[in-house]
């Protein structure tokens, strides 16, 4: 039975992932700021975590290590999005986005390094907008650039981990019908639901490490 850690589980793709792993009776720890949407159960534990806070991340890792003997799968799904014109996007806006989308991811991985199983699969959830040469959208300068940084972080960590059994990949998602998408593009209808994308991520987490390592993989049939 695998031990899975997922961030950003209160809604959207993260929420659906918890349901899918739970249905397989995997042990799941959810790191989220909103504890109201997923109750604790026999194999699912929910930990209040602010990924912009190193102290909160450390507390979450302590909980993980108390609960799990090792971690098989880590899915860094949590994301912060601000949709503002660049000339109205403040230093604080950029900082808040990067803290969750980049710094928090790096710190969580760093603190879990001794806890990963052999092999372990880390999956960073990014955006197609963070890939060089992809279509870009006005108002997402902080979000898309942070996802670009996350993509490079994945490639750098591959270089550092490649002699180990830690596999790391990034899935750069296109349009998925979530609250985050609706906030960025009100009224836009995405071709995929959160559950459909979660099903793909689940399968990739279990088998993708056999075929990919250190890769930024576009997962998109549409990009608003």
Stretch-by-stretch model annotation:
Residues 10, 18:
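N-terminal Rossmann NAD(P)H-binding glycine-rich loop of SDR-like oxidoreductase domains
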Residues 109, 143-149:
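Active-site helix of classical SDR
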Residues 114, 155-160:
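Alpha-helical segment proximal to the catalytic Tyr-Lys
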Residues 170, 186-224:
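C-terminal helical subdomain
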């Amino acid at each position: 039975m695998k031990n899975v850690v997922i961030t950003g589980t209160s809604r959207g793709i993260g929420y659906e992932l918890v349901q899918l792993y739970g249905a397989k009776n995997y042990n799941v720890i959810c790191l989220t700021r909103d504890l109201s949407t997923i109750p604790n159960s026999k194999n699912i534990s929910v930990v209040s975590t602010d990924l912009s806070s190193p102290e909160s991340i450390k507390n979450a890792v302590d909980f993980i290590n108390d609960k799990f003997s090792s971690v098989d799968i880590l899915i860094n799904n949590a994301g912060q999005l601000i949709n503002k014109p660049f000339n109205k996007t403040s230093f604080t806006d950029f900082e808040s986005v990067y803290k969750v989308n980049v710094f928090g991811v790096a710190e969580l991985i760093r603190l879990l390094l001794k806890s990963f199983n052999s092999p372990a699969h880390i999956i960073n959830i990014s955006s197609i907008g963070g890939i060089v040469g992809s279509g870009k959208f006005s108002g997402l300068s902080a979000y898309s650039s942070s996802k670009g940084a996350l993509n490079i972080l994945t490639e750098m960590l591959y270089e550092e981990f490649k002699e180990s059994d830690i596999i790391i990949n990034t899935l750069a998602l296109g349009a998925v019908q979530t609250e985050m998408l609706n906030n960025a593009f009100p009224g836009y209808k995405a071709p995929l639901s959160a559950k459909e994308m979660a099903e793909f991520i689940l399968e990739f987490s279990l088998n993708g490490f056999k075929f990919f390592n250190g890769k930024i993989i576009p997962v998109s049939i549409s990009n608003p």
